């Protein structure tokens, strides 16, 4: 039990104008709506009923209004609701007064319903409900129309409002758990009956709740209006003992009342990343549900519904678990398990580990960020996901009330009445048993549940673990046969040399640079493997990616083989756990010889060279036969089916079936047959060598893969004379044959983890069958058979086409038997005669010549080269619909009206040299465009306009540049805020015209980045506030953006520090990006940028460059359409980038909806880049992408070259506008009617590409407007900060460098306090110039981002508590947080500030008398801090500064930490096991200088906070010093603070 001490410019287009975005989309929820929110609950520990608790719940809900959002009318809330104990006092009196019926509470229930609006429909629905209740032996006591005040609704919510009724019933037979189940069964029967009858209003019928215990009031209202709308909630007779509340932020603005939360049991803040897989596995599982209470499954199923939200489906599955005898906490442990493997907190809780192990064998996790609050009336509680990606703070009061919410301070409580404060950590749970009146902590409730059944015994009896055996020690095939098979399966020499060999040597995926400038597989003239038609999806905004390297403790690639038929009872089925899905040939032999019956299906089909249709029919028929064979094997008891193409290809008349097609087809077929859960699929294939290939096979249903030909290739390569010579000469590591095979497999495993993690998925078992891809280039018949549920928007290959491409690949192996080397098709690197590359040498030379000679005729030659290229992008299949009404060229807007729409891509100074970076900035400023700083900060010297340029174009301020002019500006108009926050200071932010939040990058979405130490020169280190030579890691996610409401908070932060700038958000094109963009617009961004998959990069895994993201044409079209549909298009500017090179590209982008246009690679080429493609090596031969001084001196570019390119581009655009008959770009934005399919473009592979989604429009009604300005009524300022900055005494102190102290009240709705003040000071004095002192004392609970961007001269002292993001990007000053003096609890043990504090801080001090949440000091650059406890991942990615922790710490300390020093007090002797030692080392405090620094920081902590614990430490210093650990990254290992010998050497000198 928890210990509680008593005292201690666009075209407006109608919604109907667009066809469905996805032609193949049975799963609309997955792509068209996502949500986030603020949640919480309040409960009386003694289960006492009262109306005060209801009023408290409404107050708490109202204080989280900023976590929700509204529709485009800015008045209709996305949803708010409250689930609470049924106020039986009210309903008993109502029944007696109006129905003359005395309710028996133990047998009665109340259902809350949304009904259709028409009175006739209402009556029909009521009749059905009554009829079924009566058929099931219920007495219908009566209907009650719920009173409401519709005037509080916004226009859209009112338009879609249902009729709201309650029905009160009483069972004649049932009570208790039996009543619960029968209410569930009756509700499902009613829902199904209405669906079966297919009434036009069926979608408007909805049960909010139907229970003996709980009732739900919800709607499309703001949280501040819920009680005003539902007058019942203010009724004093509405006495309750608990309430769950929820405020929704949806990425869709069309009101849908049923999607408001809480659901019937859960209030969910998060996103299920594996939803499609979870739904399909649940569909497969339903046919084999086995439990005594489920003898009427047919009346209950289907349990899940693809048209429902992730929250609604999760709620339905939890509900099912409840009705087969499990509790809410148990169901959530089953479905959303914590990270139990290698968890030091659980090492003494073996039975709990056994529970998780047992469940993992039968139930995949519903994986993703989630804070879930829940109640079924028996318990109320909350559970957090395994990564802790949502905040959850709680407190207990003296009058025995428990409050938990997404924020602290949701109720204004007297501090003296609070007995306990805490938070949920990753994977943790808190539960109040209402019947037992028992509050249970995380381990209490979980150990109690784990002890209910003998899970350890069940595991011992029924589970085996496959112990991986050694690899083969010799080859199994002659070299010529290997060569033949490699050719048949589609290997090229690049696959061997760049991928397989690299992985075998290094044990990691190969890294490459720039983007993918080759044709899409479906457009290519070369044969491709089927995997190339699949693009990986990734997380952006609505959920974060994970760092699979530094946070591996939450990830697992283990999975299970065998039958998984029953999730509800003890099962005698044997299962086999495998620790990796990558199997060697020996592993496969062990599996075949295991207790699990295993059979093999050979996956080949008969080839007919003379008839594509016959080939297609042969392929289709063979797959159908395999499916039927598999079903027969399952019915005969087979538990594992191996799909194998390991056969000898003796003739051309036989071809393998692409393994992805086989596994996908079987997976889908077996689900539909209801037997999928009875068998595991293993793929034994020669066509699998890249991490992307493995991900596809697993994502479509395979449990494991044996890549026999890839392993054989590794063996032959190792045994080759060339490899042996290289090893003997020391030119490559001296590795054994076993080691290279192991390296290859480990690199695949690491690559898989990265693919999972960039979608925010932690567990391979959740990824298997989850289909987290988008298809580019497969037709409906192929998708429906093998990949149902995966979106394929442009159609593509039929079975005949696919069969022919496969046969072409396979037959090539027979025609090239005498060759000594595989073909090199140039899929990665350009080569003459190979695959076409847009960035080819001929193009680069043509552009260089044109811009250097300033010759438009030469530019036209460059343009013609690109116009005559083979089809490469989707836009190549489109053409302009020229009309006869052209306009004279002189009437078209001038060049500089067009160039002001141009931007360069976000390329960092660090990835680029100073010369290249500054040249681009000057050029863009000259033409009125906007350059983008990229990540990494910017030299403040660049913020001043040049005035010292001589007649030769040189400036002493920038002696390394040429071709300068007086009046030039080197300041990037767009300054980027990326996940590393390098160089983000107040001064940097206030010198921007736009601030760009980079969520994703086209070439590596969801992956973050890394600047190698060799590129961190002294100059780069100065800008990024770190030491030279230190590797700098940018995390995959922004650690202050785990959800859409988090993004809204960051946008709000930026608007505070720089109120004059617009905020842009950079996204990468993928299915569903339109949904995300709607959320981004609602979050307050004025600009949304959509990047294509072919964008450039300084360094990225090769598989990401080739296989992640989709073309910008699809993303831009989707975003524009959905913004129009949601009435938000006028509020944002749309920008697009990714492979734009010509005016034709720009005009096509405009027609698809873009207002502005970004250029990266082509701008660099104009500036001198020769596409050497060695950016990742720091060896660029022309000084563009290097920090080596001698190479930078070779940089050939001058600003005029870049200016010339953009002038030529604008002139080309003017000519096209003239031909189209328009005078401005604004007039054609979104004009899909000006696009046609280009029938002149002939494709090699198929005639089935469908581009109609881009130009099929049902009406031509347009209303032309100028470029939107991003204006909104949405509040963009902190009222408290506004009042502070408009206070005359503060303004006087700022202007005159005076000292001033003020005292101010604060609440959780006061967000970003201090940011506006910091921005004002930075604008006036830069980061360091203010010489006065502002001391602001706040009292209460601070909202998010307290002290963000704090600056020198400002002290923020908070007496109370703070929420997340304290001190974000602070550059100076002090932040002090202490509890009120009247608190009764031990302050050092309590949570006083939230998650992700000191994120990206570059200076200043933070002192906190209490503990922080997760990720304290993440990416801290140079701030100093002392506090008394931290959660998981403290000091992650830290590059400088000092952190002192005087209390308990979570796991994974110092992951990715490359600089700075941290000190941890280890009172429990368990800290070493919590430190991530991949980079840092841990030692005691060994030097006098370190002791001195540590004691000085603790003394200052005492001075600032009065900490009793710190006082005790100082009093007993000689004892406590021996309990401190010092964490030391390599960059600090040779300093006098960390190295005794260095210290003595310094002293000696």
Curated annotation (Swiss-Prot):
**Catalysed transformations (reactions):** 2 oxidized [2Fe-2S]-[ferredoxin] + 2 L-glutamate = L-glutamine + 2 reduced [2Fe-2S]-[ferredoxin] + 2-oxoglutarate + 2 H(+)
Question: Amino-acid biosynthesis: is it a keyword of this entry?
Answer: yes
| Pfam families xref list | GATase_2, Glu_syn_central, Glu_synthase, GXGXG
Q: Which residues form the Glutamine amidotransferase type-2 domain?
A: 37-435
Q: Which domain of life is it from?
A: Eukaryota
* Entry keyword Lipid metabolism: no
Positions of [3Fe-4S] cluster binding = 1169, 1175, 1180
Which UniProt keywords are given for this protein, alphabetically ordered?
A: 3Fe-4S, Amino-acid biosynthesis, Chloroplast, FAD, Flavoprotein, FMN, Glutamate biosynthesis, Glutamine amidotransferase, Iron, Iron-sulfur, Metal-binding, Oxidoreductase, Plastid
Q: Identify the EC number(s).
A: 1.4.7.1
Protein's recorded name: Ferredoxin-dependent glutamate synthase
Q: Which organism is it from?
A: Cyanidium caldarium (Red alga)
């Amino acid at each position: 039990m928890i210990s509680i001490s008593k005292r201690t410019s666009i075209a407006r287009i109608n919604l109907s104008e667009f066809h469905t975005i996805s032609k193949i989309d049975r799963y609309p929820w997955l792509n068209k709506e996502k949500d986030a929110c603020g949640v919480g609950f309040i409960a009386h520990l003694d289960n006492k009923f009262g109306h005060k608790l209801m009023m408290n719940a409404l107050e708490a809900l109202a204080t989280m209004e900023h976590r929700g959002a509204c529709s485009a009318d800015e008045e209709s809330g996305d949803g708010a609701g409250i689930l609470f104990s049924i106020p039986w006092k009210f309903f008993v009196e109502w029944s007696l007064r109006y129905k003359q019926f005395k309710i028996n509470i133990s047998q009665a229930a109340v259902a809350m319903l949304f009904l259709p609006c028409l009175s006739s429909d209402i009556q029909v629905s009521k009749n059905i409900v009554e009829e079924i209740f009566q058929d099931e032996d219920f007495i219908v006591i009566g209907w009650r129309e719920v009173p409401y005040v519709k005037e509080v609704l916004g226009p859209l919510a009112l338009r879609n409002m249902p009729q709201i009724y309650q029905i009160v019933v009483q069972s004649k037979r049932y009570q208790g758990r039996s009543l619960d189940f029968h209410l569930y069964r009756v509700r499902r029967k009613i829902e199904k009956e209405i669906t079966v009858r297919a009434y036009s209003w069926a979608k408007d019928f909805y049960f909010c709740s139907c229970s003996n215990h709980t009732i739900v009031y919800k709607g499309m209202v703001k949280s501040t209006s819920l009680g005003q709308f539902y007058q019942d909630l203010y009724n004093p007779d509405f006495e309750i003992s608990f309430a769950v509340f929820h405020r929704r932020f949806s990425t869709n603005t069309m009101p849908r009342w049923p999607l408001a939360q809480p659901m019937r049991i859960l209030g969910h803040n998060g996103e299920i990343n594996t939803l499609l897989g979870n739904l399909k596995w649940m569909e497969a599982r339903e046919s084999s549900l086995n439990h005594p209470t489920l003898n009427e499954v047919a009346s209950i199923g289907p349990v899940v519904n693809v048209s429902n939200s992730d929250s609604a489906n999760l709620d339905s599955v939890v509900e099912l678990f409840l009705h087969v005898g499990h509790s809410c906490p148990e169901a959530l442990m089953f479905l959303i398990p914590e990270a139990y493997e290698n968890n030091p907190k659980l090492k003494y809780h073996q039975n709990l580990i056994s529970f998780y192990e047992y469940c993992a064998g039968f139930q995949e996790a519903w994986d993703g960020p989630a804070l879930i609050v829940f109640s079924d009336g028996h318990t109320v509680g909350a559970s957090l996901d395994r990564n802790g990606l949502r905040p959850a703070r709680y407190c207990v009061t003296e009058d025995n009330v428990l409050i938990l919410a997404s924020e602290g301070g949701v109720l204004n409580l007297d501090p003296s009445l609070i007995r306990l404060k805490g938070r949920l950590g990753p994977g943790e749970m808190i539960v109040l048993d209402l019947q037992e009146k028992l509050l249970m902590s995380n381990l209490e409730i979980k150990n109690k549940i784990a002890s209910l059944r003998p899970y350890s015994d069940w595991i011992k009896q029924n589970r085996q673990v496959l112990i991986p055996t050694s690899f083969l020690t010799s080859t199994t095939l002659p070299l010529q046969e290997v060569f033949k098979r490699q050719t048949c399966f589609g290997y090229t020499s690049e696959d061997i040399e760049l991928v397989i060999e690299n992985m075998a040597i290094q044990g990691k995926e190969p890294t490459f640079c720039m983007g993918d400038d080759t044709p899409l597989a479906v457009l290519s003239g070369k044969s491709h493997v089927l995997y190339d038609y699949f693009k990986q999806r990734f997380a952006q905004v609505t959920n974060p990616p994970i760092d699979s390297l530094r946070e591996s403790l939450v990830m697992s690639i283990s999975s299970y083989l065998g039958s998984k038929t029953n999730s509800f009872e003890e099962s005698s089925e044997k299962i086999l756990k495998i620790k990796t899905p990558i199997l060697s040939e020996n592993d496969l032999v062990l599996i075949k010889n295991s207790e699990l019956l295993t059979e093999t299906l050979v996956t080949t089909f008969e080839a007919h060279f003379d008839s594509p249709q016959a080939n297609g029919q042969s392929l289709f028929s063979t797959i159908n036969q395999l499916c039927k064979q598999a079903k027969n094997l399952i019915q005969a008891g087979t538990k594992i089916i191996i799909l194998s193409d390991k056969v000898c290809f003796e003739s051309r008349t036989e071809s393998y079936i692409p393994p992805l097609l086989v596994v996908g087809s079987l997976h889908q077929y077996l689900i539909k047959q209801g037997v999928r859960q009875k068998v595991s699929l293993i793929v034994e294939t020669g066509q699998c060598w890249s991490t992307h290939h493995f991900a596809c096979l697993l994502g479509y249903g395979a449990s494991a893969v044996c890549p026999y030909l890839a392993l054989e290739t590794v063996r032959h390569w190792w045994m080759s004379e060339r490899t042996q010579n290289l090893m003997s000469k020391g030119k490559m590591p001296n590795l054994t044959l076993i080691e290279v095979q192991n390296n290859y497999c480990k690199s695949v495993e690491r690559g898989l983890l990265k693919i999972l993690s960039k979608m925010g998925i932690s567990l391979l078992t959740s990824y298997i069958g989850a289909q987290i891809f988008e298809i580019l280039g497969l037709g409906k018949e192929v998708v429906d058979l093998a990949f149902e549920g995966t979106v394929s928007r442009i159609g593509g290959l039929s079975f005949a086409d696919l069969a022919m491409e496969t046969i072409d690949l396979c037959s090539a192996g027979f025609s090239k038997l005498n060759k000594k080397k595989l073909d090199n098709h140039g899929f990665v690197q350009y080569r003459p005669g190979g695959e076409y590359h847009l960035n080819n040498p001929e193009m680069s030379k043509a552009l260089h010549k044109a811009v250097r000679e300033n010759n438009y005729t030469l530019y036209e030659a460059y343009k013609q080269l690109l116009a005559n290229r083979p089809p490469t992008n989707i836009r190549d299949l489109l053409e302009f619909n020229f009309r006869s009404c052209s306009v004279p060229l002189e009437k078209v807007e001038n060049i500089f009206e067009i160039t002001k729409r141009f931007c360069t891509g976000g390329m960092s100074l660090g990835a680029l040299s100073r010369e290249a970076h500054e040249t681009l900035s000057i050029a863009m400023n000259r033409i009125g465009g906007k350059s983008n700083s990229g990540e990494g900060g910017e030299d403040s010297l660049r913020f001043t306009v040049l005035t010292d340029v001589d007649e030769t174009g040189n400036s002493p301020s920038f002696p390394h540049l040429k071709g300068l002019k007086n009046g030039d500006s080197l300041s990037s108009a767009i300054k980027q805020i990326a996940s590393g926050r390098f160089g983000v200071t107040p001064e940097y932010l206030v010198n921007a015209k736009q601030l760009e939040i980079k969520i994703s990058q086209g070439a590596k979405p969801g992956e973050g980045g890394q600047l190698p130490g060799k590129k961190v020169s002294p100059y780069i280190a100065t800008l990024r506030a770190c030491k030279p030579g230190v590797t700098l890691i940018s995390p995959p996610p922004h650690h202050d953006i785990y959800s859409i409401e988090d993004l809204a908070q960051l946008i709000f932060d930026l608007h505070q520090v720089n109120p004059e700038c617009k905020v842009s958000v950079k996204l990468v094109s993928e299915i569903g990006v339109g949904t995300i963009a709607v959320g981004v617009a609602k979050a307050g961004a004025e600009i949304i940028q959509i990047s294509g998959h072919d964008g450039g990069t300084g360094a990225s895994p090769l598989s990401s460059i080739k296989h992640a993201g989709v073309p910008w044409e699809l993303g831009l079209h989707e975003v524009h359409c959905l913004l129009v549909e949601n009435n938000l298009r006028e509020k944002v500017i749309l920008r697009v980038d990714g492979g734009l090179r010509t005016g034709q590209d720009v005009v096509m982008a405009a027609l698809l909806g873009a207002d502005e246009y970004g250029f990266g690679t082509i701008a660099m080429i104009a500036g001198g880049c020769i596409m050497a493609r060695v950016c990742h090596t720091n060896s660029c031969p022309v000084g563009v992408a290097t920090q080596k001084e001698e190479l930078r001196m070779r940089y050939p570019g001058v600003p005029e070259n870049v200016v010339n390119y953009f002038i030529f581009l604008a002139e080309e655009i003017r000519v096209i506008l003239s031909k189209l008959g328009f005078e401005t770009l604004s007039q054609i934005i979104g004009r899909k009617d000006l696009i046609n399919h280009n029938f002149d473009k002939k494709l090699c592979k198929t005639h089935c590409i469908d581009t109609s989604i881009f130009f099929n429009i049902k009406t031509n009604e347009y209303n032309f407007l100028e470029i939107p300005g991003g204006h909104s009524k949405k509040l963009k300022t902190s009222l408290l900060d506004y009042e502070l900055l408009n206070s005359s005494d503060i303004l006087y102190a700022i202007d005159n460098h005076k000292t001033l102290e003020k005292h101010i009240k604060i609440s959780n709705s006061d967000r970003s306090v201090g940011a506006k003040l910091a921005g004002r000071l930075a604008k006036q004095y830069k980061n360091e110039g203010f010489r006065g002192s502002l001391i602001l004392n706040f009292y209460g609970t601070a909202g998010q981002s307290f002290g963000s961007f704090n600056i020198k001269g400002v002290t923020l002292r908070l007496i109370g508590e703070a929420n997340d993001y304290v001190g974000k990007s602070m550059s100076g000053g002090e932040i002090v947080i202490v509890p009120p003096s009247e608190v009764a609890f031990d302050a050092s043990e309590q949570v006083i500030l939230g998650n992700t504090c000191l994120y990206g801080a570059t200076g200043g001090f933070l002192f906190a008398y209490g503990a922080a949440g997760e990720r304290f000091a993440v990416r801290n650059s140079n701030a100093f801090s002392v506090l008394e406890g931290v959660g998981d991942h403290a000091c992650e990615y830290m590059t400088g500064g000092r952190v002192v922790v005087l209390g308990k710490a979570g796991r994974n300390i110092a992951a990715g930490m490359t600089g700075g020093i941290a000190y941890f007090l280890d009172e429990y002797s368990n800290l070493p096991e919590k430190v991530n030692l991949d980079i840092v080392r841990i030692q005691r405090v060994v030097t006098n200088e370190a002791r001195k620094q540590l004691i000085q920081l603790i003394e200052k902590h005492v001075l600032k906070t009065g900490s009793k614990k710190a006082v005790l430490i100082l009093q007993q210093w000689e004892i406590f010093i021996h309990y401190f650990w010092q964490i030391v990254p390599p960059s600090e290992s040779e300093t006098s603070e960390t190295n005794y010998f260095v210290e003595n050497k310094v002293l000696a000198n």
